[in-house]
């Protein structure tokens, strides 16, 4: 069911954002579109939107229970959630607990190396530039955020990692790395935004020792491993076992 909403405000690779009568809130629809390599690889995956929406809702609520401020208000339907309206900061914030992916391609660090403390990486959110890796000095040069706001972002991101790592470990998942986005309300409040799902997290199954079978995230799509939705469904099943009843806005 499509809920009542106002005009489309923004459409990204995985979500659409619609206006609401309450100007401080918006509706987010999670799509079935799958993309990789800056949208060079595309596909439609049935049920992806529902699974990512439902996983994100539960993880946002988990984080709020640990005093992490998020934009999440509640579910509206299987693929829709209501969130607080924010201006997204054009930074992709990545926390890495285990070396893999681009970190291993760009450095001599061996695949699977544990990173303690977690590596905090920043990427400029710009498709035309390929979302380049930034230093903190470049963030300041670009004027993306001030130093104190960047410090607050890092503090929140590390807090999210501290909460999610043991949560996932309890359901036999290892949080390898993940991407976060943050936004600012009209009143200047910093909130965790976007989503937290197998699209944005690398999750390895502790119940499997096979290097491909253990992957339960978007890397299955990136690497043509198959079983993408089965993997997302398994993540949802385990998350739901700990967080069964997310709130809704109906």
Swiss-Prot record:
* GO terms, molecular function: ATP binding; phosphoribosylaminoimidazolesuccinocarboxamide synthase activity
What's one GO BP annotation on this UniProt entry?
'de novo' IMP biosynthetic process
Is ATP-binding found in the keyword set? Answer: yes
Quote the catalytic activity from the record: 5-amino-1-(5-phospho-D-ribosyl)imidazole-4-carboxylate + L-aspartate + ATP = (2S)-2-[5-amino-1-(5-phospho-beta-D-ribosyl)imidazole-4-carboxamido]succinate + ADP + phosphate + 2 H(+)
Q: Matching SUPFAM superfamilies, A to Z? A: SAICAR synthase-like (SSF56104)
Output the Gene3D superfamilies linked to this UniProt entry. ATP-grasp fold, B domain (3.30.470.20), Phosphorylase Kinase, domain 1 (3.30.200.20)
One matching Pfam family: SAICAR_synt
Q: Which NCBIfam families match?
A: purC (TIGR00081)
In Swiss-Prot or TrEMBL terms, this protein is called Phosphoribosylaminoimidazole-succinocarboxamide synthase
């Amino acid at each position: 069911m499509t809920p009542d909403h106002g005009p489309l405000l923004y459409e990204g690779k995985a979500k659409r954002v619609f206006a609401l009568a309450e100007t401080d809130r918006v509706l987010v629809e999670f799509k079935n579109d799958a993309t990789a390599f800056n949208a060079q690889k595309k596909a439609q995956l049935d049920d992806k939107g529902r699974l990512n929406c439902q996983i994100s809702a539960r993880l946002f609520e988990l984080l709020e229970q640990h005093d992490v401020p998020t934009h999440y208000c509640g579910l509206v339907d299987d693929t829709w959630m209501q969130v607080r309206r924010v201006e997204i900061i054009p930074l992709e914030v990545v926390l890495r607990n285990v070396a893999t992916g681009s970190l291993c391609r760009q450095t001599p660090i061996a695949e699977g190396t544990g990173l303690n403390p977690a590596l905090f990486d920043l990427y400029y959110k710009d498709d035309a530039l390929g979302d380049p890796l930034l230093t903190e000095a470049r963030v300041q040069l670009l004027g993306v955020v001030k130093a104190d706001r960047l410090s607050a972002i890092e503090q929140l991101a590390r807090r999210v990692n501290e909460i999610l790592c043991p949560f996932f470990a309890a359901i036999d998942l290892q949080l390898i790395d993940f991407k976060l986005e943050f936004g600012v309300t009209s009143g200047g409040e910093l909130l965790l935004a976007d989503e937290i799902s197998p699209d944005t997290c690398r999750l390895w199954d502790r119940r499997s020792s096979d290097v491909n079978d253990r992957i339960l995230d978007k890397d299955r799509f990136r690497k043509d491993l198959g079983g993408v939705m089965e993997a997302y469904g398994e993540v949802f099943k385990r998350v739901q076992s700990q967080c069964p009843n997310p709130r809704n806005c109906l």
